[in-house]
A protein has these predicted regions:
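Conserved N-terminal phosphate-binding loop of PLP-dependent enzymes in the Aspartate aminotransferase
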Residues: 1-277
């Protein structure tokens, strides 16, 4: 924040929703935590809603540790934004295109944002491309203005034909191979495999939704910030790639994953965690 905060002034932050004392080992959306959405209302009372342009949120926090929203949380955020005429923007760079078994997290949670940011899965990350989807009301507001202009927000490589071709081909594969449904069908298999690791050495929490999961470690033995990278290294040496960040692992298998591959992932994690003392 010291380095980047001054570059983006006028931004307030909601508290994240993870609380291991109240929601550890939740499968899917935690039961506890809906009240945390009302922190947005408190911020708006302090700042005056008329000064707030938009609320930007990841429906599921991805690289920050797979923080799954409590039941009703996103619905409440939508309700507050609508009440105060504030735009709701979903960052679906990670959750979009099948990761949660649906085209978008907005579909999974039945919450309609005003804008969706997307990338990664748009081209299967084979070539850089991102996009923003707008609600028609925003588009129409611009195009029917007294002096209409285009929805101008372009860069040097906007609409790059190679990236667009990759995106179209990727969308075809999603449809032809029914990958969103495969992710949906594999979710309970993935969930069971991950939560079978509960009770292992220094495991503080396991959480999951769709084909996203995280294992959080405590420092009851060696420091968690040393434990997580050692688990990563052990898995890597056994040809299973997970991601570590400080004191947790993120597991996010590809949309084509099958039960035998999920079993291999959980076996590698079990062996790695059990080997460290």
């Amino acid at each position: 924040r010291k380095s980047f905060g001054p570059l983006l002034p006028g931004v307030d932050h909601l508290p994240h929703t993870w609380d291991p004392e109240n929601m550890a080992f939740s499968k899917g959306q935690p039961e506890w935590g809906l009240h945390l959405a009302d922190e947005l209302e408190k911020i708006l009372i302090l700042q005056d809603p008329a000064t707030v342009a938009a609320v930007i949120i990841e429906p599921v926090i991805g690289s920050g540790g797979v923080i799954v929203p409590p039941k009703g949380y996103l619905e409440r955020i939508r309700e507050i934004c609508t009440k105060h005429n504030i735009l709701l923007i979903f960052d679906e760079v990670i959750t979009g295109f099948g990761r949660l078994g649906h085209a978008f997290a907005a579909d999974r949670f039945s919450v309609k944002p005003d804008m969706i940011c997307m990338a990664k899965g748009l081209t299967s990350a084979m070539i850089p491309m991102s996009a923003v989807a707008f609600d028609n009301s925003i588009y129409d507001q611009i195009m029917t203005a007294e002096t209409p202009i285009e929805l101008f927000h372009g860069y040097t490589y906007s609409g790059h034909p190679v990236a667009c071709a990759a995106g179209l081909a990727t969308l075809d594969v999603y449809e032809e191979d029914d990958l969103f449904n495969n992710a949906k069908n594999m979710e309970p298999v993935f969930e069971e495999a991950l939560h079978s690791l509960k009770g292992l050495n220094q495991v503080l929490d396991i959480r999951n939704i769709g084909l996203m999961g995280a294992i959080h470690f405590n420092s009851d033995g060696i420091p968690a910030k040393e434990f997580a990278p050692r688990v990563f290294q052990h898995c890597y040496e056994n040809d299973v790639l997970v991601r570590f960040s400080v004191d947790y692992l993120v597991i996010s298998p590809s949309l084509i994953v099958q039960p035998e591959q999920i079993e291999r992932i959980s076996d590698a994690l079990r062996a790695a965690i059990s080997s460290i003392n």
